[in-house]
Amino acid sequence: MNKKLIISDLSLAYEEKNAVLANIDLDINGSEILCLLGPSGCGKTSLLRAIAGFENINSGSIIKDGTCISNNLENTPVSKRNMGMVFQDYALFPNMDVNSNIAFGLKGIPKKEKNERVEYLLDLVNLKQCNQKYPHELSGGEQQRVALARALAPSPDMLLMDEPFSNIDEEIKEELVSDVRDLLKKLSITTIFVTHDQYEAFNIADKVAIINNGTIQQKGNPYDIYHKPVNKFVADFIGLGVFLPIKNVNDIDFEIPLGMLDNQKIQHDSFKDKNIEILIRPDDIIHNDSSNLKAVVKEKQFRGAEFLYKLLYNEKYPLLCYAPSHHNHSIGESIGIELDIKHYVIFEK
């Protein structure tokens, strides 16, 4: 598969400050959606700005379609990169209606062709009924669709999106994220998407790069990022979970406070004579009232179809557990649980 963008050994630092990004290696295939995911201040937006051409890099290179567009000596202007940009705050012109906002970037083409392009984009983002409205008359989701249509208007071959759903109400966010993914796939446009929200990333991305302190911690598909984190930062940042100590009973058997582990799933030589612990996610604990293994409910969060229970086992070990919401247990109640770990995620302490 052709590489649309290749980033090699990229570093970026602002004057008199430590490196914002260091030794970034990343690539994205044509038509792929890549998400840059990490906590606030980790460097993900700086990387997006460097790709767009807004920031000069100190070392390394960015190659697009086989041509270098950034290194420490040259920086192809933003306007020459053929990239569309969707900003966090939408950046719509308040004095222009939807039609005019979308048409803003369509310079030097006949009016008839421009109108046809705007009409096509309005239909694409399902906003034909809003074409004469002004930004203040639109919902957050509608404004985001206008911003997306405007970014797509000049027919870029790559789209950059910076926290595009951060200002969207939660009740419509899931549908909007799904709609945007469907649209990007329909257009087969290569997209790089920045967010701090793992659920957005998992819902929209083909590939995810986890960034922390200016470096890439892990990259891969969402499934592997969740089930096979390469370090404790990724394990902690992605999803919910707790760590429990592992005791090496003998050369082949391993035990945690909840019971014995399947020694066939453990690389014995890698962990011999080491102080190790295992990640236990809520889906590794099954609620079973008939189980002899009991834990006390310390907190609970109602999530509609289910509860997230925060438990304490043996007065010492915190656990998390999902249960259908018709199992409405009280704080302080002792409930039955079972251990059902499908993926062993083990790290040294």
Say what each PLM segment does.
Residues 1-7, 11-23, 72-76, 110:
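A short, flexible loop at the N-terminus of ABC-type nucleotide-binding domains that lies
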Residues 34-35, 85:
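Short beta-strand immediately N-terminal to the Walker A/P-loop
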Residues 37-39:
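The feature captures the beta-strand-to-loop junction immediately N-terminal to the Walker
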Residues 52:
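Helix-to-loop junction immediately C-terminal to a conserved catalytic motif
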Residues 58-61, 213:
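Conserved coupling/switch loops of ABC nucleotide-binding domains, chiefly the family-specific signature
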Residues 60-71:
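Conserved ABC transporter NBD signature motif
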Residues 82-84, 92-233:
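ABC ATPase nucleotide-binding domains
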Residues 241, 252-349:
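Non-catalytic connector elements of ABC transporters
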